[in-house]
Amino acid sequence: MALEDRCSPQSAPSPPHHHHSSQSPTSTTTVTMATASPVPACTTTTTTTSTSGASAASSPTRDEMSLVVPISPLHIKQEPLGSDGPMPAQPPHHHQHPHHHQLPHHPHHQHHPQQQPSPQTSPPASISFSITNILSDRFGKATAEQQQQPHPQPPAIREPISPGPIHPAVLLPYPQHVLHPAHHPALLHPAYHTGLHHYYQPSPSHPQPIVPQPQRASLERRDSLFRPYDISKSPRLCSSNGSSSATPLPLHPYHTDSDCSTQDSTSAPSPATYGDIASPSSASSAMTTPVTTSSPTGSVYDYSRKASALDHRAALLNGFSAAASYPKLHEEIINPPQVPGEADRIANEGGTGCGGHGCCGGSATPHNMPPLGSLCKTVSQIGQHVAGTGSLNGSGSAANGASNGGSGAPATAKPTPKPIPKPAPSSETNGSSSQDAGMESSDDAKSETSSTKDGSENGSNLWPAWVYCTRYSDRPSSGPRYRRTKQPKEKGDSEEKRPRTAFSNAQLQRLKNEFNENRYLTEKRRQTLSAELGLNEAQIKIWFQNKRAKIKKSSSEKNPLALQLMAQGLYNHSTVPLTKEEEELEMRMNGQIP
């Protein structure tokens, strides 16, 4: 059973009306294609009717078997790939590179050379409880889909598509990391499985293969970076698909919900760069991916959670912008579709390593998987907010935390940042009533908001406090500043409304003569003029001040700072109309005149 076709999506019970279901236990050869790697064909084992049937070099280990519910008489039926009828069992030596160019023309395979077809065998009546089938949302629907839409391509060997059970012959040796499901929680990481459904989300024209997990333990010696949860599944590295890996393949447009994963094969992040993990010919693998890619995130993320090898900054330094790279995924992260029962389900099932996704073999009963949207949301949040924490070996709790806050740590971090609190929150509601608590600390701000113009804009235009410290009229509150209206003083009505002094011609002539002699009065001269002309000293003093101001204004002797500010459009406090020259200068500096 463990060797029962690792890539076939048909491991669900086939509908009874399926016209090709041969109920006889035909023994088919599960052929795994290797890249041009000298390792001999290891998995050409014909699984007949026993679960623990004879197996070649990669017979299921006890770890694998614990991940699969043994189903005794296992009937293998041959699924047709197209109109060619059932596929003959491929001989083991068919293992070399016969079907290299068959799939690249298929529209949904997106020319990933990895996705080569393999003999699609599945038990007709017995349900295979391999974890990937249980978790995939195609559980029980695969064969129906396949019947409705036969494959366009001829029968070919369907190779193990990268997710996880990569054939050892295909993988490059990374001996320092030993993959063992028993003590490597990364193998059981729910992200691996959820990535799996993503990677094989049923596309309308053909069922994409789903690889059962059990074979994984037989690959302990190799670095099997399971592609479905390879870099692109980890939202931290969604963008590092294109950026970090040295794979020269183009990024293909995504066609599933949040298809970080359809691009997995292109920019393979694994050390053995999965460009062609399962591609039959060495030519394509050599062509697309350098054998030992210098992908920094590759070795870091093969196990996606190896605490010793995991440098959390590697992901961030590779530049993750989910919004830019995968808008749909980003949108799902930010606006997660809430599936009502999923949080409780995940929380109840969550063993530490297995994360309640049924990956421990003990819970091999099919779950009601919610639609992929929320699942993607939980998986994609695993990496995003926990990027800074230690290792995520409690992978289940990380997935749970994203959906129901079950994990400690920032897995429950909010996807969207809270807006910065505005300086005067109460003024949003108060509108024009400006004298609210937030503004009362700043005297200048009160004068701003108490003005009619700013008061009406206060609800929409809230500015930080430092803005109101500036004295220039270019402040964002716009428009000229308004001074606070002074409260009328009761005592000085006569002072405030003193009528304008009307000087007689004799008085004016005398004042002009004095002014021509000396523009500035001394106290003695002021007293003398006051006695002669019958005027107050204050009136004489003010007349001299006004006369000096008029002459200064007419001679255009402006303060250089005032001229500079006026040229920038900042100095509009003039109490006297501008002269022609000043208006022209200001308009020219403002760009209104060429």
From Swiss-Prot:
Residues 496-555 bind DNA. Residues 92-112 have a biased composition (Basic residues). GO terms for molecular function: DNA-binding transcription factor activity, RNA polymerase II-specific; RNA polymerase II cis-regulatory region sequence-specific DNA binding. PROSITE patterns: ENGRAILED, HOMEOBOX_1, HOMEOBOX_2. It comes from the Eukaryota. One of its GO terms (biological process) is cell differentiation. Pfam families: Engrail_1_C_sig, Homeodomain. Residues 487-499 have a biased composition (Basic and acidic residues). Residues 1-64, 76-127, 141-164, 198-217, 231-299, 387-458, 474-501 are annotated as: Disordered. SUPFAM superfamilies: Homeodomain-like. Residues 237-247, 426-436, 448-458 have a biased composition (Polar residues). CDD domains: homeodomain (cd00086). This is Segmentation polarity homeobox protein engrailed. It comes from Anopheles gambiae.
